[in-house]
Regions:
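Charge-rich, low-complexity N-terminal segments
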Residues: 1-175
Length: 175
């Protein structure tokens, strides 16, 4: 069986963000930041024009997602112990065990994840990208979406979506 894919990485597929990771034993890193980079692979049937997708149509979608996270403090809103609250004055309070933080709402993104690991960030971005690709390209016969979030050189968390072969739409490849 033949498969086709496109790999997309641009220098602007990056975001700088603060976070702290919470470990299984309850300990946590100090608040710190990374300059994250995002890499995307999309595998699908070829269009009648011999393309998986046009790069120039995908790049703005990825850029919008990474830009939405840039220069924010990422808080894991679904962590079972961490608590957060937005005060009436627009300040977000975050409590984890004995730690207390307060920051302007505009600086904080409370994410629907249980930890701000690179794996969870890749999952969130990957799922958002998948939804946007489906909405923008309803005829896309997507087989696989791979999205990596690199927090430091050579160290990435990866989200991988693979379509169920029985449910995956197909397009006739270019002749």
């Amino acid at each position: 069986m033949e498969r086709w894919s496109i790999d997309i990485y641009k220098e602007y597929f990056k975001f700088s963000a603060a976070h702290f990771l919470i470990f299984p034993d309850g300990s946590a890193e100090r608040l710190h930041g990374h300059n994250y980079r995002v890499f995307v692979e999309i595998a699908a049937e070829l269009t009648s024009h011999g393309l998986v997708l046009d790069f120039k149509q995908v790049k703005p979608i990825v850029r919008e997602l990474v830009d939405s996270l840039d220069e924010h403090w990422l808080v894991p809103g679904k962590h079972p112990v961490l608590r957060w609250n937005e005060r009436d004055d627009g300040v977000v309070e975050v409590r984890y065990l004995e730690r207390y933080y307060a920051a302007p709402r505009s600086d904080v993104i409370v994410m629907p994840i249980n930890n701000t690991s690179s794996e969870n960030l890749a999952t969130w971005i990957g799922r958002e990208l998948h939804q946007r690709l489906r909405a923008r390209f309803p005829d896309l016969a997507l087989h696989r979406l791979r999205l990596a979030v690199e927090e430091t050189a050579g160290q990435s968390g990866v989200y991988l979506y693979t379509a169920n072969e029985a449910q995956a739409p197909t397009r006739k490849p270019a002749e």
